[in-house]
């Protein structure tokens, strides 16, 4: 079993969720047999995912810091949901999202040089490039070019189509399904409840990277949901002696947990700072930073012991990081040295997706701290490149259909859960939309 259960107690967060004699997979009542990756190589299944998942679940599209003032906006391309949205802070200070489409002839409303590229800015109103229809920041149609030429048009009926929008701890979510009445906080479940109060608002130094990956979106989530591969694929990121030790002993998690469609893994973090400086590379010794972030944790207003209960749920002394997957495609990683990393996986086809990584730090107070953060950010980019390259090789061979059954170990329990969840959403959608039987 990966990790060791702690003693019991009434607090569900501060005890290991795994019983002493069971594997994690069996504990969560997940089948332990070989799995198929047919859901990752099928164009037909991807089309079902678009309607069953991405048009019906809460999707994280950004943070409130991207909208610092009234009139601030950004657009988000949601190819998997067949949509583009514009997210804006209104004159009343509220954050809203609208379908990015003009009500006149369906032109994309907000874009710059290239319609498929995302954009951002500040404005007093949105004006269509095609015929100059204008909308205020709350989506109301305020101007129609040559309005008298239309046949009794009621402009009050042609405002922008609003999208359900809610904010959790500064993260902006949208839901494209007008019939979905589940509040965001309810959907995010116990993990969000247990993270409430973490000072995300203090982490305003942002580093972003983006890549177009030639693999199914779920395969990249799989890569970051297990550490089984880390000692092998990423061996070059460690000093040779440390790499050999990690390869010998493996890299196991402290605990796993599942809540509905969502999941999390809690991990040790012994190299921030390392017990011995010989474990890390010279640049890491000089800058006191690396894979687990800057070694000198900034003040965020709470100690490690005071973190919200879902973070380091076993309260293990060697804890280093927790990784939460909020289904379908938002991964939130909270690190012991007081910084945060998010991953987003935006499908563009059954075998391609856009991967976004964003590092959030407390703003540096001097040049040295800025370099510490830069090293952490570029270190993660290197890890991402190694994973992305490998996943493109995986996708190619899965599509050969030479092998269709794959054994997974206990450390890969969250992979099973992700694919089971995806297939469950698709099955439910198919059943709900099946034609009624004829008499």
Language-model features, listed with the residues they occupy:
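Short linear motifs in intrinsically disordered
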Residues: 62-69, 154-155, 320-324, 358
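Short hydrophobic core segments
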Residues: 49, 101-102, 127, 220, ...
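Short Pro/Gly-enriched beta-strand edge/turn motifs at strand-loop
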Residues: 56-61, 68-69, 144-149, 324-329
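C-terminal catalytic domain of Rieske-type non-heme iron oxygenases
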Residues: 94, 166-167, 171-439
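N-terminal pre-ligand scaffold of iron-sulfur
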Residues: 2-113, 165-166
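N-terminal short leaders/motifs
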Residues: 15-45, 114-130, 161-169, 270-309
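Rieske [2Fe-2S] iron-sulfur-binding domain
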Residues: 66-178, 182-193
């Amino acid at each position: 079993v990966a990790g060791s259960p702690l003693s019991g107690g009434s607090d569900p967060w501060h005890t290991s969720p795994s019983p002493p004699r069971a594997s994690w997979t069996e504990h969560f009542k997940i089948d332990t047999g070989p799995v198929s990756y047919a859901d990752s190589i099928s164009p037909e299944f991807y089309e079902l995912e678009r309607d069953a998942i991405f048009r019906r679940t809460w999707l994280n599209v950004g943070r409130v810091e991207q909208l610092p003032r009234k009139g601030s906006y950004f657009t988000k391309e949601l190819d998997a949901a067949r949509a583009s949205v514009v997210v804006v802070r209104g004159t009343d200070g509220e954050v809203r999202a609208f379908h990015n489409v003009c009500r006149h002839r369906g032109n994309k409303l907000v874009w710059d040089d290239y319609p498929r590229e995302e954009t951002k800015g500040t404005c007093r109103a949105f004006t269509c490039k095609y015929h100059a229809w204008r909308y205020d920041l709350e989506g109301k149609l305020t101007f129609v070019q040559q309005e008298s030429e239309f046949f009794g048009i009621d402009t009050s009926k042609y405002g922008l189509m609003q999208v359900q929008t809610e904010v959790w701890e500064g993260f902006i979510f949208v839901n494209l399904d007008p019939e979905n009445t589940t509040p965001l906080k309810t959907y995010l479940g116990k993990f969000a409840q247990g993270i409430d109060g973490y000072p995300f608002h203090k982490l305003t130094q942002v580093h972003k990277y983006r890549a177009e990956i030639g693999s199914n979106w779920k395969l990249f989530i799989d890569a970051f949901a297990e550490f089984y591969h880390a000692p092998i694929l990423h061996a070059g990121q460690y000093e040779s002696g440390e790499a050999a030790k990690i390869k010998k002993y493996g890299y196991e998690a402290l605990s796993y947990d599942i809540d509905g469609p969502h999941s999390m893994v809690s991990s040790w973090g012994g190299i921030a700072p390392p017990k011995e400086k010989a474990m890390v590379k010279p640049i890491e010794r000089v800058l006191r930073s690396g894979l687990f972030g800057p070694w000198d944790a900034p003040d965020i207003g709470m100690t490690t012991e005071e973190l919200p209960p879902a973070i380091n749920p076993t309260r293990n002394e060697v804890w280093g990081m927790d990784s939460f997957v909020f289904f379908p495609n938002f991964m939130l990683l909270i690190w012991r040295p007081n910084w945060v990393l998010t991953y987003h996986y935006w499908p563009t086809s059954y075998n391609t997706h856009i991967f976004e990584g964003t590092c959030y730090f407390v703003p540096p107070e001097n040049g040295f701290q800025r370099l510490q953060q830069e090293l952490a950010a570029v270190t993660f980019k290197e890890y991402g490149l190694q994973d992305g390259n490998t996943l493109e090789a995986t996708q190619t061979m899965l599509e050969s259909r030479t092998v269709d059954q794959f054994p997974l170990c206990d450390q890969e329990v969250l992979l099973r859960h992700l694919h089971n969840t995806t297939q469950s959403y698709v099955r439910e959608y198919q059943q709900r939309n099946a034609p009624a039987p004829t008499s």
